[in-house]
Amino acid sequence: MNKFLILDGMNLVRRIHAAQPNEADISGLKERVHGACKKLLKFHQPSHVAIVWDGNAISWRKALYEDYKKGRKPMPEALSNGLGDIKSYLAEHHIASLEADSEADDVIATLATKLVSIGGEAIIVSTDKGFCQLKHPNIKQWDHFNQTYMTVEAMEQKLGVEHKQFIDYLALAGDSGNKIPGVPGIGPKSAVELLKIFRSLANIYSSIEQVGSKQAKKLEAGKHLARLSYKLVQLQLDMPLNANLKQFRLPKANS
Protein backbone atom coordinates (compact mmCIF):
# COMPACT_ATOMS: atom_id res chain seq x y z
CA MET A 1 0.00 0.00 0.00
CA ASN A 2 1.24 3.49 -0.88
CA LYS A 3 1.79 5.56 2.25
CA PHE A 4 1.82 9.27 1.44
CA LEU A 5 3.16 11.91 3.82
CA ILE A 6 1.54 15.27 2.95
CA LEU A 7 3.17 18.29 4.56
CA ASP A 8 1.26 21.55 5.01
CA GLY A 9 4.16 23.73 3.88
CA MET A 10 3.38 27.13 5.38
CA ASN A 11 1.95 25.63 8.56
CA LEU A 12 5.23 23.78 9.12
CA VAL A 13 7.65 26.50 8.01
CA ARG A 14 5.99 29.42 9.77
CA ARG A 15 5.84 27.51 13.05
CA ILE A 16 9.54 26.64 12.77
CA HIS A 17 10.38 30.22 11.77
CA ALA A 18 8.41 31.60 14.76
CA ALA A 19 10.89 29.97 17.14
CA GLN A 20 13.59 32.37 15.85
CA PRO A 21 11.61 35.15 14.14
CA ASN A 22 14.44 37.69 13.90
CA GLU A 23 16.81 35.40 12.05
CA ALA A 24 17.98 37.24 8.92
CA ASP A 25 19.96 34.38 7.36
CA ILE A 26 17.60 31.85 5.76
CA SER A 27 20.21 29.07 5.80
CA GLY A 28 19.56 28.24 9.45
CA LEU A 29 15.82 28.01 8.86
CA LYS A 30 16.45 25.89 5.77
CA GLU A 31 18.39 23.37 7.85
CA ARG A 32 15.77 23.31 10.61
CA VAL A 33 12.95 22.70 8.11
CA HIS A 34 14.96 19.93 6.48
CA GLY A 35 15.71 18.48 9.92
CA ALA A 36 12.00 18.43 10.74
CA CYS A 37 11.26 16.70 7.43
CA LYS A 38 13.96 14.07 8.07
CA LYS A 39 12.44 13.38 11.48
CA LEU A 40 8.98 13.02 9.93
CA LEU A 41 10.26 10.64 7.26
CA LYS A 42 12.07 8.51 9.81
CA PHE A 43 9.05 8.28 12.09
CA HIS A 44 6.32 7.68 9.49
CA GLN A 45 8.32 5.68 6.91
CA PRO A 46 6.24 6.76 3.88
CA SER A 47 6.62 5.57 0.31
CA HIS A 48 5.77 9.06 -1.01
CA VAL A 49 6.12 12.61 0.30
CA ALA A 50 4.97 16.04 -0.89
CA ILE A 51 5.06 19.47 0.69
CA VAL A 52 2.07 21.56 -0.40
CA TRP A 53 2.37 25.35 -0.59
CA ASP A 54 -0.16 28.17 -0.71
CA GLY A 55 -0.30 30.06 -3.99
CA ASN A 56 -0.72 33.78 -4.63
CA ALA A 57 -4.17 33.75 -6.23
CA ILE A 58 -7.11 35.10 -4.22
CA SER A 59 -8.83 32.09 -2.71
CA TRP A 60 -12.47 31.33 -3.41
CA ARG A 61 -13.09 31.81 0.31
CA LYS A 62 -11.68 35.34 0.24
CA ALA A 63 -13.74 36.08 -2.87
CA LEU A 64 -16.85 34.83 -1.06
CA TYR A 65 -16.12 36.65 2.21
CA GLU A 66 -13.74 39.60 2.18
CA ASP A 67 -12.93 39.37 5.91
CA TYR A 68 -11.75 35.75 5.65
CA LYS A 69 -8.39 35.48 7.49
CA LYS A 70 -8.40 39.26 7.90
CA GLY A 71 -5.85 40.65 10.32
CA ARG A 72 -3.33 37.82 9.99
CA LYS A 73 0.25 38.98 10.16
CA PRO A 74 1.88 39.06 6.73
CA MET A 75 4.73 36.67 6.07
CA PRO A 76 8.05 38.15 7.26
CA GLU A 77 10.02 39.53 4.31
CA ALA A 78 13.10 37.37 4.96
CA LEU A 79 10.95 34.24 4.98
CA SER A 80 9.03 35.29 1.88
CA ASN A 81 12.27 35.94 0.00
CA GLY A 82 13.79 32.67 1.17
CA LEU A 83 10.90 30.31 0.37
CA GLY A 84 12.29 29.49 -3.07
CA ASP A 85 15.61 28.44 -1.53
CA ILE A 86 13.81 26.27 1.03
CA LYS A 87 11.77 24.54 -1.69
CA SER A 88 14.87 23.92 -3.82
CA TYR A 89 16.81 22.56 -0.85
CA LEU A 90 14.01 20.17 0.06
CA ALA A 91 13.72 19.04 -3.58
CA GLU A 92 17.45 18.19 -3.55
CA HIS A 93 16.63 15.87 -0.65
CA HIS A 94 13.73 14.16 -2.49
CA ILE A 95 10.93 16.21 -0.89
CA ALA A 96 9.00 17.53 -3.88
CA SER A 97 6.73 20.57 -3.75
CA LEU A 98 3.14 20.75 -4.90
CA GLU A 99 2.00 24.33 -5.53
CA ALA A 100 -1.63 25.28 -4.92
CA ASP A 101 -3.13 28.17 -6.88
CA SER A 102 -4.32 29.74 -3.63
CA GLU A 103 -4.91 27.87 -0.35
CA ALA A 104 -3.03 24.63 0.22
CA ASP A 105 -5.78 23.17 2.44
CA ASP A 106 -8.10 22.17 -0.41
CA VAL A 107 -5.25 20.65 -2.41
CA ILE A 108 -4.12 18.65 0.63
CA ALA A 109 -7.68 17.44 1.25
CA THR A 110 -8.12 16.51 -2.43
CA LEU A 111 -4.82 14.64 -2.54
CA ALA A 112 -5.55 12.73 0.67
CA THR A 113 -9.04 11.65 -0.40
CA LYS A 114 -7.89 10.61 -3.88
CA LEU A 115 -5.11 8.50 -2.35
CA VAL A 116 -7.38 6.60 0.00
CA SER A 117 -9.92 6.08 -2.80
CA ILE A 118 -7.29 3.98 -4.62
CA GLY A 119 -6.28 2.04 -1.51
CA GLY A 120 -3.49 4.26 -0.19
CA GLU A 121 -2.84 5.82 3.20
CA ALA A 122 -2.43 9.57 3.79
CA ILE A 123 -0.76 11.25 6.74
CA ILE A 124 -1.35 15.00 6.82
CA VAL A 125 1.27 16.93 8.78
CA SER A 126 -0.49 20.07 10.01
CA THR A 127 -1.88 21.68 13.15
CA ASP A 128 -4.93 22.99 11.24
CA LYS A 129 -8.04 21.59 12.91
CA GLY A 130 -9.99 21.93 9.66
CA PHE A 131 -8.54 18.63 8.46
CA CYS A 132 -10.47 16.86 11.24
CA GLN A 133 -13.48 16.83 8.91
CA LEU A 134 -11.71 14.22 6.73
CA LYS A 135 -12.92 11.13 8.53
CA HIS A 136 -11.46 8.01 6.93
CA PRO A 137 -9.55 5.14 8.57
CA ASN A 138 -6.65 5.67 6.14
CA ILE A 139 -6.38 9.45 6.62
CA LYS A 140 -4.46 10.54 9.70
CA GLN A 141 -3.33 13.94 10.89
CA TRP A 142 -0.02 14.42 12.68
CA ASP A 143 0.89 17.41 14.86
CA HIS A 144 4.67 17.58 14.44
CA PHE A 145 5.13 20.16 17.18
CA ASN A 146 3.35 18.16 19.87
CA GLN A 147 4.41 14.80 18.38
CA THR A 148 0.91 13.39 18.43
CA TYR A 149 -1.95 12.38 16.15
CA MET A 150 -4.89 14.77 16.02
CA THR A 151 -7.64 12.18 16.25
CA VAL A 152 -11.36 12.48 15.64
CA GLU A 153 -11.93 11.28 19.20
CA ALA A 154 -9.74 14.05 20.65
CA MET A 155 -11.54 16.64 18.54
CA GLU A 156 -14.95 15.38 19.67
CA GLN A 157 -13.87 15.52 23.31
CA LYS A 158 -12.36 19.00 22.99
CA LEU A 159 -15.32 20.61 21.20
CA GLY A 160 -18.10 18.56 22.77
CA VAL A 161 -19.71 17.60 19.45
CA GLU A 162 -19.68 14.52 17.23
CA HIS A 163 -17.45 14.38 14.18
CA LYS A 164 -20.40 14.67 11.78
CA GLN A 165 -21.38 17.92 13.56
CA PHE A 166 -17.95 19.56 13.18
CA ILE A 167 -18.85 21.81 10.22
CA ASP A 168 -22.26 22.64 11.74
CA TYR A 169 -20.52 23.61 14.98
CA LEU A 170 -18.15 26.03 13.23
CA ALA A 171 -21.02 27.43 11.14
CA LEU A 172 -22.72 28.38 14.42
CA ALA A 173 -19.78 29.27 16.67
CA GLY A 174 -17.42 30.61 14.01
CA ASP A 175 -13.64 30.29 13.93
CA SER A 176 -11.77 33.36 15.18
CA GLY A 177 -8.43 32.13 13.81
CA ASN A 178 -9.73 32.24 10.24
CA LYS A 179 -12.21 35.08 10.86
CA ILE A 180 -15.15 32.82 10.02
CA PRO A 181 -18.09 34.72 11.53
CA GLY A 182 -20.56 32.08 12.65
CA VAL A 183 -23.85 33.37 14.08
CA PRO A 184 -23.39 36.54 16.17
CA GLY A 185 -24.33 35.84 19.78
CA ILE A 186 -24.09 32.04 19.41
CA GLY A 187 -20.78 31.05 20.94
CA PRO A 188 -19.20 27.60 21.41
CA LYS A 189 -21.31 26.73 24.47
CA SER A 190 -24.63 27.56 22.79
CA ALA A 191 -23.56 25.81 19.60
CA VAL A 192 -22.85 22.60 21.52
CA GLU A 193 -26.18 22.80 23.37
CA LEU A 194 -28.15 23.38 20.17
CA LEU A 195 -26.44 20.51 18.35
CA LYS A 196 -27.05 18.14 21.28
CA ILE A 197 -30.77 18.86 21.04
CA PHE A 198 -31.31 19.26 17.28
CA ARG A 199 -28.35 17.21 15.95
CA SER A 200 -27.61 19.38 12.89
CA LEU A 201 -27.63 22.94 11.55
CA ALA A 202 -30.43 22.07 9.12
CA ASN A 203 -32.58 20.67 11.95
CA ILE A 204 -31.99 23.77 14.08
CA TYR A 205 -33.37 26.02 11.35
CA SER A 206 -36.23 23.69 10.38
CA SER A 207 -37.26 23.53 14.06
CA ILE A 208 -36.60 27.18 14.90
CA GLU A 209 -39.97 27.54 16.64
CA GLN A 210 -38.76 25.03 19.26
CA VAL A 211 -35.70 27.13 20.10
CA GLY A 212 -35.91 29.67 22.93
CA SER A 213 -37.02 33.09 21.70
CA LYS A 214 -33.71 34.83 22.52
CA GLN A 215 -31.61 32.31 20.62
CA ALA A 216 -34.18 32.03 17.83
CA LYS A 217 -33.86 35.77 17.14
CA LYS A 218 -30.08 35.49 16.93
CA LEU A 219 -30.32 32.45 14.67
CA GLU A 220 -32.82 34.10 12.33
CA ALA A 221 -30.77 37.31 12.15
CA GLY A 222 -27.58 35.35 11.47
CA LYS A 223 -28.98 32.73 9.10
CA HIS A 224 -27.07 34.09 6.10
CA LEU A 225 -23.83 34.07 8.12
CA ALA A 226 -24.44 30.47 9.23
CA ARG A 227 -24.80 29.42 5.58
CA LEU A 228 -21.75 31.44 4.59
CA SER A 229 -19.66 30.02 7.45
CA TYR A 230 -20.70 26.47 6.53
CA LYS A 231 -19.37 27.01 2.99
CA LEU A 232 -16.15 28.63 4.20
CA VAL A 233 -15.33 25.78 6.59
CA GLN A 234 -15.88 22.96 4.10
CA LEU A 235 -12.77 21.58 2.44
CA GLN A 236 -12.96 21.15 -1.33
CA LEU A 237 -12.17 17.61 -2.48
CA ASP A 238 -12.09 18.13 -6.23
CA MET A 239 -9.18 20.49 -6.82
CA PRO A 240 -7.03 19.93 -9.94
CA LEU A 241 -3.73 18.43 -8.82
CA ASN A 242 -1.75 18.51 -12.07
CA ALA A 243 0.66 15.99 -10.60
CA ASN A 244 1.61 12.34 -10.95
CA LEU A 245 2.04 10.03 -7.97
CA LYS A 246 5.42 8.89 -9.30
CA GLN A 247 7.00 12.32 -8.88
CA PHE A 248 6.54 12.09 -5.10
CA ARG A 249 7.91 8.57 -4.63
CA LEU A 250 10.90 8.40 -2.33
CA PRO A 251 14.06 6.51 -3.30
CA LYS A 252 14.23 3.13 -1.59
CA ALA A 253 16.87 4.32 0.87
CA ASN A 254 14.55 7.10 2.11
CA SER A 255 11.22 5.29 2.17
Curated annotation (Swiss-Prot):
The keyword Nuclease applies. Mg(2+) binds at residue 105. Disulfide bonds: none annotated. Residues 162-254 form the 5'-3' exonuclease domain. GO terms for biological process: DNA replication, Okazaki fragment processing. Its EC number is 3.1.-.-. Binds 2 Mg(2+) per subunit. Only one magnesium ion has a direct interaction with the protein, the other interactions are indirect. K(+) binds at residues 172-173, 181, 183, 186. Pfam families: 5_3_exonuc, 5_3_exonuc_N. Its cofactor is Mg(2+); K(+). GO terms for molecular function: 5'-3' exonuclease activity; 5'-flap endonuclease activity; DNA binding; magnesium ion binding; potassium ion binding. Coiled coil: none annotated. Belongs to the Xni family. This is Flap endonuclease Xni. The gene is xni.
